[in-house]
């Protein structure tokens, strides 16, 4: 099953007062973190839908940006544009907003997993988390074949995400159902992934929390300079993990997260429980 990521960045952020996509997050931005989490969940491509003439913070080269020509119609308009852009390249898209500062890759994987079920996965149109009794349509997975359905809803001025579910086959996952997944239960037992920030006070409270605790190790010649470890550190990005062991993430250093080589992307987001390894690019470790 080909799965993509779709980030809706074009909201007006009226309650926040400033665009959420560009809000600072531990040396990065909320939008950059969201795109990185989707990449780490194995989604490709990752597409960002923005409003007309909206300026976005810097993003990796492999993140695609799609312009929504119509502003002010809410998330369904952005979904219609994004699902259409993905329809020929992915069967399913995890659709989310930019205001999920604690989104974890394991939540994304959990929501996508039912589509791969050999018996009834093909029949599903939507997998919808229902956290603490509230549906989460902007942290959900949708068949890209729903693009014309969503576009028709927008054309009919039926702009609430709930209208998608009226004629779709929807699997709703409440807290207990989500946490039957052992990996998600270990990584995010309280489902912080589904906490969003709508107002400035929400953002300030989220930003005041400590960065995730990760394990950092150095190998080869870097171990002699920074200590082999492993050592615990608070770091929200690979760059912050490097600084925690007094390393400069330059062309001489390579990073791997949980065994997957990531190169030198200092803004790649980290999540609680990650292990970050640094090795010398010159000596291969």
Specify the residue positions occupied by each region the protein language model found.
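Nucleotide and nucleotide-moiety/phosphate-recognizing core
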Residues: 1-138, 144-158, 167-191, 272, ...
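Acidic phosphotransfer microenvironment of two-component signaling modules
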Residues: 29, 201, 260
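The catalytic Nudix box helix
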Residues: 31, 198, 241
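An accessory alpha-helical subdomain
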Residues: 160-162
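Conserved anion/nucleotide-ligand pocket segment
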Residues: 195
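Ubiquitin-like/PB1-type beta-grasp interaction modules and other compact soluble beta-rich domains
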Residues: 204-284
